[in-house]
Amino acid sequence: MDKKILIATHGELAKGFQSSLNILAGKGDEIQVINAYVSDEDYTPQLVEFIESVKENEQGVIFTDLFGGSVNQKALTEVLTAKKENIFIISNANLAVVLSIIFSVENVLTKEAIEAAINESQVKLVETTISSDDEDDFF
C-alpha cells in the first residue's frame, strides 16, 4: 500500500526535516511539508489538500512538531472532519521516527507498527561523563 507523508510544523522545521531526509535517504522530494506561521498565509488549504489526496487504497502519515500545539490540533481537526481513518498523526516527531516510517517494511502501517517505530526513535541521553579509571591511563 502506498504511503503519503506530510510534515507540518511551526516555523521552518518541516523544511529542515525535508532537507535532512533528502541528504540521508534521498526521499526529501517525496515528502510534503507545511512551514506554518512563517507568513500571514493560512496553511489550512495545504493541509486539506494533502488529506483529500490520500486515496482509500493509500495511507497517509502527518508528522507534527508538538502534541497539542496549534498545528497538531489543526491536523487532527481536519482529519476527523474528513473522516479519513487511513491517515495517522504522529506528534512530537523527530527525524528518527520519520526515517523509520518511510523505510518501514510493513506493506500496511498499523497502529502497532507505528508505536514500535516511535518507541525505537525515542530521545536518548548520550553519556559524556569521563570515568575516574580513564584518568589513571595518563599516568
Language-model regions, residue ranges each:
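N-terminal loops that bind phosphate or other acidic moieties
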Residues: 2-64, 68-139
